[in-house]
Amino acid sequence: MEYDIMRWMQDNRKIFGFTLSIKEIERSAKKIWGHNLNFTAHNREFYNPIEKSSLRSYIQVGRDTYNYCSFSTDLQIVNLNFLRSPVYTKYFEYMDKAGGIFYERWSDSIIQSMAYSTMVPAKMIQHISPMGYQNKETVVCPADDIMWREYKCECDQGSDISFNRDLTCTQRYKDTQGMF
C-alpha cells in the first residue's frame, strides 16, 4: 500500500478496520450470545444512541440468535480509545466475570466483534480490502484486479477465502453495509 492506512482511518473517523471476517467454531461460542444480550439489556444507555446505525445485523440472525460471525483479530486496526472507553471496559469486565474466556475459550475476536457490532456506528467500521493476509490455512487477497496490480500484491487471488460463505462473513458484512 502506498498510503498510510492508519492516517486514512483517523482522517475518515474510522474506529475499527479489518481484513478478515470469520465464522467462529460454535462449541467455543455457544453461551456468549446470552451474556451479550444480558449486558445489552442492563446497559441500554450505551446502545440507544447508535442502535439503528450499528452493525448488529452482521452478528445477529432474527431477534436474538448469534450467527457466529466475528472480525478476525489476526490483522485489524483499532482506535485504542474505544478499547479504553468506559463502555468497552465495562463490557469486557462483564464478559470476563461470566467465565467464558476461561471455561469456554471465548476469544478476543468474538468479544471485540460483538462490541464493535453493537457499540460502534457501522460507518466507523471499515473492511480494509487492499490489505492482504496469509497464514498456513488462510489467504486474504484483494479481489479487485486493478487494486491487486496497483498495490503490487503477490498473493494468489484464486486462493482467497474472503467471500467463501462457509468460512467467512465478509460478504455478510458487505451485504449489511449495502455494498455489493
Locate each region found by the language model:
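Conserved catalytic core of nucleotide-sugar-dependent glycosyltransferases
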Residues: 1-97, 105
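C-terminal catalytic/acceptor-binding lobe
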Residues: 69-71, 88-180
